[in-house]
């Protein structure tokens, strides 16, 4: 059996790992042993698994592997932010960012090689789209970051306390693989991260938002960026498929469905000078969010070459922030981190092959796939 045919155990959730061992004729408890070695001790070889018999280790080496994405570059910012560039098997690359903040350590994870949602202010979208990432490649970013920080002996003794699916790509357009990876993050045999500390950021793929609230009610962030459809159509093209009225209704449903105590949805709003930062935009935003438990996170735009946008003036950001808070909308201003290593929000680019043609094909497929999802949902109702 070639290396390409081997099962990569890094990307298997607990039920999948148990099924794998059952098909080998082994007991289910072997799954627990191997999961701990992989995710608690960051093992990359079966020979490291000293409580697994030699015969089984040999058998595993013939049919399986533990293989994460390859680290090709690491940068450390003056503020302590760390960025890794990971090479994919096909030659593309993605970027992953770790942001330390006191006792909290947040890992920003990518879900696709590139992105075809093509938000006009985001450098990732400018790079085009190549493919979805596998569950092993997604959880492999957490695994590799954990290896960089050293082995974890017990839960709670690890600098990664939070994970945000806010790296390259639209997570809900790679739903199944992202879901598997998040289940591994949440599992005590994986990384033991509570569901309220795992956040999925979406540009508004409504059918998958509805499904996520039923499958794994993690925290949700919505890339909003505009208070009306006309402007959001320009900034976030997916809005043409899922307009704000439908998106706000989906947010209300999600908030009602999640079971953990913190059911507030984060609304991400990048501040673009003279584009979406005027007083009338603040007034429209308050009206739009009325009745939805939200927190607005204002994000000063992080420039990149040929962006076509500028960061809002500091005073405009402060006035926008004040108006929202004064009118009952909890609002914060995100502190820019890692901009000196191009690790700030909207700056991740990685490396994508055949950018233009792949991106155009994927944009078409987004609308085709979401239409199919809508049709399937209608048939089941």
Curated annotation (Swiss-Prot):
This is Dual-specificity RNA methyltransferase RlmN. It comes from Alcanivorax borkumensis (strain ATCC 700651 / DSM 11573 / NCIMB 13689 / SK2). Its EC number is 2.1.1.192. S-adenosyl-L-methionine binds at residues 169-170, 201, 223-225, 302. It catalyses: adenosine(2503) in 23S rRNA + 2 reduced [2Fe-2S]-[ferredoxin] + 2 S-adenosyl-L-methionine = 2-methyladenosine(2503) in 23S rRNA + 5'-deoxyadenosine + L-methionine + 2 oxidized [2Fe-2S]-[ferredoxin] + S-adenosyl-L-homocysteine; adenosine(37) in tRNA + 2 reduced [2Fe-2S]-[ferredoxin] + 2 S-adenosyl-L-methionine = 2-methyladenosine(37) in tRNA + 5'-deoxyadenosine + L-methionine + 2 oxidized [2Fe-2S]-[ferredoxin] + S-adenosyl-L-homocysteine. Keywords: 4Fe-4S, Cytoplasm, Disulfide bond, Iron, Iron-sulfur, Metal-binding, Methyltransferase, rRNA processing, S-adenosyl-L-methionine, Transferase, tRNA processing. Reaction proceeds by a ping-pong mechanism involving intermediate methylation of a conserved cysteine residue. GO terms for biological process: rRNA base methylation; tRNA methylation. Disulfide bonds join 108-345.
């Amino acid at each position: 059996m070639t290396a390409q045919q081997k099962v990569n155990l890094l990307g298997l959730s607990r039920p999948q790992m148990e099924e794998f061992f059952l098909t080998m004729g082994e007991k289910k408890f072997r799954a627990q042993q191997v999961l701990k070695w992989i995710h608690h001790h960051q093992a990359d070889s079966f020979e490291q698994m000293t409580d697994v018999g030699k015969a089984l280790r040999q058998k595993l080496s013939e049919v399986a592997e533990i293989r994460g994405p390859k680290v090709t570059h690491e940068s450390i910012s003056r503020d302590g932010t760390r960025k890794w560039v990971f090479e994919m098997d096909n030659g593309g690359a993605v970027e992953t960012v770790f942001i330390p903040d006191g006792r909290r350590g947040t890992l920003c994870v990518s879900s696709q090689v590139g992105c075809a949602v093509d938000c006009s202010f985001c450098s990732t979208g400018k790079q085009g789209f190549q493919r979805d990432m596998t569950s092993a490649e997604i959880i492999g970013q957490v695994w590799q970051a954990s290896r960089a920080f050293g082995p974890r002996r017990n839960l709670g003794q690890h600098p990664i306390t939070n994970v945000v699916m806010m790296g390259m790509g639209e997570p809900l357009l790679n739903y199944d693989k992202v879901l598997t990876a998040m289940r591994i993050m949440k599992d005590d045999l994986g990384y033991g991260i509570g569901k309220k500390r795992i956040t999925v950021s979406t540009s508004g793929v409504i059918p998958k938002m509805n499904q996520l609230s039923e499958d794994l009610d993690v925290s949700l962030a919505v890339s909003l960026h505009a208070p009306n459809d006309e402007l959001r159509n320009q900034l976030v093209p997916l809005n043409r498929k899922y307009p704000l009225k439908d998106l706000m209704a989906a947010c209300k449903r999600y908030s009602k469905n999640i079971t953990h105590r913190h059911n507030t949805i984060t609304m991400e709003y990048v501040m673009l000078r003279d584009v979406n930062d005027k007083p009338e935009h603040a007034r429209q935003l308050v009206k739009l969010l009325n009745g939805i438990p939200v927190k607005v996170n204002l994000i000063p735009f992080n420039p990149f070459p040929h962006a076509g946008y500028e960061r809002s003036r500091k005073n405009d950001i402060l006035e926008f922030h004040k108006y929202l808070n004064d009118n009952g909308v909890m609002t914060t201003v995100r502190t820019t981190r890692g901009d000196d290593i191009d690790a700030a929000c909207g700056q991740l680019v990685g490396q994508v092959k055949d950018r233009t043609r792949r991106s155009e094909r994927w944009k078409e497929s987004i609308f085709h796939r979401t239409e199919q999802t809508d049709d399937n949902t209608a048939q089941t109702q």
